[in-house]
Design a protein with these regions (language model features):
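Metal-dependent phosphoesterase signature
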Residues: 56-91
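Short amphipathic alpha-helical patches
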Residues: 34, 38, 46-51, 66-70, ...
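A residue-identity detector for tryptophan
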Residues: 5, 33, 62-63, 74, ...
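C-terminal cap/substrate-recognition subdomain and adjoining C-terminal extension
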Residues: 1-2, 82-210
Length: 210
């Protein structure tokens, strides 16, 4: 059994930007009529601000924006959006090229979205495992069946690993970062770094660029 696993967030950690929010905006711009459901989208945004209700909030947003979208249309939009993404940070690309076979990428973004971006950037060199939010259809729209965010990233299979390195840009991922013997905070603001160090004094900062 390996004892040198790496756990990595995706958005703003391996690649710049929030591809989850970006995909939602991309779908909305190409469908437009879900703007009629803007009150539902806004309500979802407000509910999302309540930490214990994040999954319900993001589900409302997803449902309103994807209502009536076919599975084929969903796959086409994901593929098209992946082609617009800027790529991986140079340091992230080097990490995955060298150590991808021991890397678990764990993201709040839909798994199909993360895998699509990784496949485009590293064809034939995907990480050991890619975990993300699992989507399903309900009442005519898409929503997360499982929202892989924050503490929920620490799945039983993750707890069973011996992790040498964990990396993320987000304070929501402190539980993930705490799994690693070594932890990297990617491109933090001074305030974010201060908050992270209060919980994980050993955390290191990394400045990554495209």
């Amino acid at each position: 059994m390996r004892t040198d696993w790496i756990l990595a967030d995706f958005d703003d950690t391996l690649a710049p930007g929030d591809s989850h929010a970006g995909l939602l905006r991309y779908i909305l711009r190409r469908r437009l009529w879900p703007l009629l459901l803007l009150p539902v989208i806004a309500l979802g945004g407000l509910v999302y601000l309540v930490p214990s209700r994040r999954r319900q909030g993001i589900s409302l947003i997803w449902w309103a924006i994807t209502l009536g979208l076919s599975p084929l249309g969903w796959r086409k939009l994901v593929r098209a959006y992946c082609r617009t993404r800027p790529g991986l940070f140079c340091e992230a690309r080097a990490l995955l090229m060298k150590d991808g076979d021991r890397c678990w990428v764990i993201s709040a973004s839909p798994r199909v979205l993360v895998r699509g971006q990784l496949h485009q950037q590293l064809p034939g060199k995907l990480p050991h495992r890619t975990l993300g939010s699992r989507m399903h259809y309900r009442l005519g729209g898409l929503m997360p069946r499982f929202y892989c965010h924050g503490q929920h990233k620490i799945l039983p299979e993750i707890r069973a690993l011996t992790v040498t390195l964990a990396l993320s840009d987000s304070l929501h991922d402190l539980p993930l970062l705490a799994q690693g013997a070594e932890a990297w905070l990617i491109n933090p603001t001074p305030l974010r770094l201060q908050k992270a160090q209060a919980c994980l004094p050993h955390i290191m900062t990394k400045r990554w660029r495209l």
